[in-house]
Amino acid sequence: MIETNVSRRHHESFLQVIQSYYQLTKPRIIPLLLITTAGSMWIAAQGQVDPVLLLVTMAGGTLAAASAQTINCIYDRDIDYDMERTRHRPMPSGKVQVRDALIFAIALAVLSFTLLTVFANLLAASLALSGIIFYVLIYTHWLKRHSTQNIVIGGAAGAIPALVGWAAVTGTLSWSAWLIFAIVFLWTPPHFWALALMIRDDYAKVGIPMLPVVEGNAATVKQIWYYTLITVVATLLLVYPLHSSGIVYAAIAISLGAVFIRKSWRLLHNPEDRPTARELFLYSISYMMLLCLGMVIDSLPLTHHLINAVINQLHLIS
């Protein structure tokens, strides 16, 4: 982290203050984290999630993610200042000072831990806190600026919300919880490397050793291809041998996975084509959201009743 010579700018209204602090949390990232939490919770609760517990866990997860992203903004303010697309963020533009942002981040973390401890359980709260610590110390401080494997290892932080959701429901972590964690972990490289292919020049400008910058596009798309295949296979392990999800989820996972593989295959053969990389990046977001939605739908008692009714009718016909 390098200090930047940014003059302090004052907000013209209280609304602008709120907007600046809201932007610090990188709110567009958070919904994707929450959907993995939801998918995990519904499977753990066998489709019958306590609405209050769901609300509390989502709120606690949001606060934890917001805290981690705020600290990330503090740490990365130097490189954000050097990139045109990020120069106008609250930290590099001088709208929010380091001390104020740090107090904000700590307050969010404390609120998250307290909320989850009181209304869920200590395991869920501890996992959320560990996610903040891992993201800040391992990814932001250590890996991001020093290793091409930054988002691979750092992807563990983004996968922790799935564990938080499971722990909030059961108070334990089963093999299914760890598999959902692994699915998100394995999905992260194709997702972020596709983005890195799109903005490779920005990363090169500020010296971030993303894989496309160091190894080139051809090597990157090969890694994307391998991780995509492994991710799709991993999603099916929830059906067999773990039996945590059923036929509805299996159909959704196979359909989504087929498209994911096809788009990754196209990028493998067009490593320099940014529109193809963008297409994969955008689809990877939809893929994870719809996959988790499939977990939710499959876990619902109504879904089970409908499947059983169809099976019984087929037996009668045969």
Curated annotation (Swiss-Prot):
One of its GO terms (biological process) is heme O biosynthetic process. It is found in: Cell inner membrane. PROSITE patterns: UBIA. Keywords: Cell inner membrane, Cell membrane, Heme biosynthesis, Membrane, Transferase, Transmembrane, Transmembrane helix. Its EC number is 2.5.1.141. It is an enzyme of class 2 (transferase). One of its GO terms (cellular component) is plasma membrane. It comes from the Bacteria. It is a multi-pass membrane protein. One of its GO terms (molecular function) is protoheme IX farnesyltransferase activity. The chain crosses the membrane at residues 29-49, 51-71, 102-122, 123-143, 151-171, 179-199, 219-239, 241-261, 280-300. Pathway: Porphyrin-containing compound metabolism; heme O biosynthesis; heme O from protoheme: step 1/1. It catalyses: heme b + (2E,6E)-farnesyl diphosphate + H2O = Fe(II)-heme o + diphosphate. It holds the Pfam family UbiA. InterPro entries: Protohaem_IX_farnesylTrfase, UbiA_prenyltransferase, UbiA_prenylTrfase_CS, UbiA_sf. Belongs to the UbiA prenyltransferase family. Protoheme IX farnesyltransferase subfamily. Carbon 2 of the heme B porphyrin ring is defined according to the Fischer nomenclature. Converts heme B (protoheme IX) to heme O by substitution of the vinyl group on carbon 2 of heme B porphyrin ring with a hydroxyethyl farnesyl side group. This is Protoheme IX farnesyltransferase. It comes from Trichormus variabilis (strain ATCC 29413 / PCC 7937) (Anabaena variabilis). The gene is ctaB.
